[in-house]
């Protein structure tokens, strides 16, 4: 009845949540699985990172959005069922079941595309990505949110894994190391917004990477229900490469499943060797293992690997595999064209688009592999517009609209934007304002700032935080949100000043931002930028 370790990669503030933002009562929030809470926050942040306004995704807008959520832990469900009958409330089932975790995201957004909870254990989130891609190809949805979550609430699973000799004694993953003896459990979550590439290009979206292909299979009958299968792993990687129309030598990097177990590591390297083992490669295939950095996030593990691979391609740098002292002697490394990164290293080739594979294998026998490629500059970039007044506006300034559900959240959002502009002083002001306008939902507490340069905008934000007057700022007000109306569109066509437009925003009008930019900047095509996300106001909702 004991665990071999209490160490792991744990998140703080298990029960903290912004119930008000998601329109949940305190009573319902108390019964909500922390995994459901995390999924809601991740979905909102994924949309904001993509520059997609969540309030424009409702069914009335005619846009189909799918939700594919990897989720496996039943800690909260077990905890709720252990309560006395008198303590059971009306929210036990909806707050605990995995099906509702995905459904709640769809409900929150008001969308009616496919909504699936995926439980294939450690491969859940990567299987969710595979299913999301299939749904997009079949045109079941225009946008797909895919991800995974994992929170550890009780010691039950850790005791089970300890008795099954799965966990390392110090809670660390030593992937591919001679001392590998098990994995360390971890909490976490991640979610990505997916579109068909042609749609993302047409929308001027910020394309982070392109999924070329994916595959899913099962071990079938192997040495045991939880035992990995070299044959099945080899097959799923080959299927994903075939779906991507790539040859093995075109892949630069593989983010492995890499749990750091004495059984699993040699089997995985054996499968990789069977696919990528040709010695005539132009450069070694680098094998990464994010579990050495974060631990094993179980249902969210595949998402951690995918996000790491995307970031590595963007920065053209591969992070080190930690806890790697001596490569596993049970693996014939000399016969394989593989490289383990003991320190951060540059991307192995400077030519062509970086290409990577990501693996995730569930202990139920379900395997997944996804092949990614860095976004082409032609797809992901557009020439930055000059910081000069467009010819059809009376003002020479750009308008930044900011809003939040509460005054405190608005102040924190202002601070985040000021920090962002300090970190990226050469950012295109026009594209910042474009993204903040069309790529965000707009709430009751509002602020509008008019500026001609990023420096001037940052100074105005600093003045707002300090309580100093600045003529560039249109005072914030507590307003109700209205509906788009013909008067607003007429004002745009009439080329009224940005000050007038800002005042309408502050007064609570639900403005038609795409029409504004289309009519005021008809010859310009803006690229959505990475901007700060919403500052959730979390409070404690727990036992």
Question: Which ranges hold each PLM region?
Answer:
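Helix-rich "cap/lid" substructures immediately adjacent to catalytic or cofactor-binding pockets
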Residues: 99-102, 499-507, 516, 520-521
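Condensing-enzyme catalytic core of the thiolase-fold
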Residues: 1-391
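Flexible catalytic loop/linker elements that gate and position reactive groups at enzyme active sites
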Residues: 228-243, 355-510, 537-540
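Acidic/polar, glycine-anchored loop/turn motif associated with catalytic or activation segments
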Residues: 43, 501, 513
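Short acidic, Pro/Gly- and aromatic-enriched capping/linker segments at domain boundaries
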Residues: 522-531
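Flexible lysine-rich "adenylation lid" loop at the C-terminal edge of ANL adenylation domains
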Residues: 531-533, 539-543
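Residue-level marker of motif borders
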Residues: 114, 252, 360, 401, ...
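Short coil/turn segments at secondary-structure boundaries
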Residues: 3-5, 56-60, 429-434, 473-476, ...
């Amino acid at each position: 009845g004991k665990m071999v370790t209490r160490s792991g990669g744990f998140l703080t503030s298990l029960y903290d949540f912004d119930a008000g933002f998601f329109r949940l009562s305190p009573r319902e929030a108390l019964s909500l699985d922390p995994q459901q809470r995390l999924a809601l926050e991740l979905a909102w942040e994924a949309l904001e990172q993509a520059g997609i306004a969540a309030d424009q995704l409702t069914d009335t807008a005619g846009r189909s959005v799918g939700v594919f959520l990897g989720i496996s832990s039943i800690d909260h469900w077990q905890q709720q069922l252990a309560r006395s009958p008198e303590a059971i409330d009306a929210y036990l089932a909806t707050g605990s079941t995995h099906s509702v975790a995905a459904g709640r995201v769809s409900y929150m957004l008001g969308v009616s595309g496919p909504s699936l909870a995926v439980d294939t254990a450690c491969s859940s989130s990567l299987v969710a990505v595979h299913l999301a891609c299939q749904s997009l190809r079949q045109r079941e949805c225009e946008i797909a949110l895919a991800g995974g979550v994992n929170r550890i609430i009780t010691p039950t699973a850790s005791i089970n894994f300890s008795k099954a000799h799965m966990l390392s004694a110090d809670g660390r993953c030593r992937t591919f190391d001679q001392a590998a003896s098990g994995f360390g459990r971890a909490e976490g979550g991640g979610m990505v917004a997916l579109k068909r590439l042609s749609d993302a290009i047409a929308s001027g979206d910020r394309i982070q990477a392109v999924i070329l292909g994916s595959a899913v299979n099962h071990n079938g009958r192997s040495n045991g229900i939880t035992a990995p299968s070299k044959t099945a792993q080899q097959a799923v990687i080959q299927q994903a490469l075939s779906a991507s129309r790539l040859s093995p030598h075109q892949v630069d990097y593989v983010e492995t499943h890499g749990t750091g177990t004495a059984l699993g590591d040699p089997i995985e390297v054996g499968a990789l060797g069977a696919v990528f083992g040709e010695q005539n490669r132009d450069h070694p295939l680098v094998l990464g293992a994010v579990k050495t950095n974060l631990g094993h996030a179980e249902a969210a593990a595949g998402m951690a690997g995918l996000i790491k691979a995307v970031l590595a391609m963007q920065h053209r740098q591969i992070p080190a595999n930690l806890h790697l002292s001596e490569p596993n002697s049970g693996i014939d490394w000399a016969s394989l064209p593989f490289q383990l990164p003991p320190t951060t290293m540059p991307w192995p080739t400077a030519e062509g688009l970086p290409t990577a594979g990501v693996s995730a294998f569930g202990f139920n026998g379900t395997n997944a592999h996804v092949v990614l490629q860095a976004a082409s500059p032609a797809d992901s970039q557009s020439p930055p517009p000059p910081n000069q007044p467009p010819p059809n506006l009376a003002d020479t300034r750009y308008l930044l609209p900011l809003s939040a559900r509460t005054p405190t959240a608005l102040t924190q959002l202002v601070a985040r934007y000021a920090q962002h502009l300090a970190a990226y002083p050469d950012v295109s002001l026009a594209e910042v304002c474009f993204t903040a306008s069309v790529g965000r939902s707009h709430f009751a507490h509002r602020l509008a700032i008019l500026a001609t340069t990023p420096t001037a905008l940052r100074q105005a934000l600093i003045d707002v935080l300090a309580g100093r007057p600045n003529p560039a700022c249109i005072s914030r007000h507590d307003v109700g949100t209205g509906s788009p109306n013909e008067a607003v569109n007429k004002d745009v066509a009439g080329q009224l000043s940005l000050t007038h437009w800002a005042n309408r925003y502050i007064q609570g009008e639900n403005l038609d931002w795409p029409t504004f930019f289309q009519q005021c900047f008809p010859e310009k095509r803006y690229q959505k930028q990475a901007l700060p996300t919403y500052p959730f106001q979390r409070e404690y909702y727990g036992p």
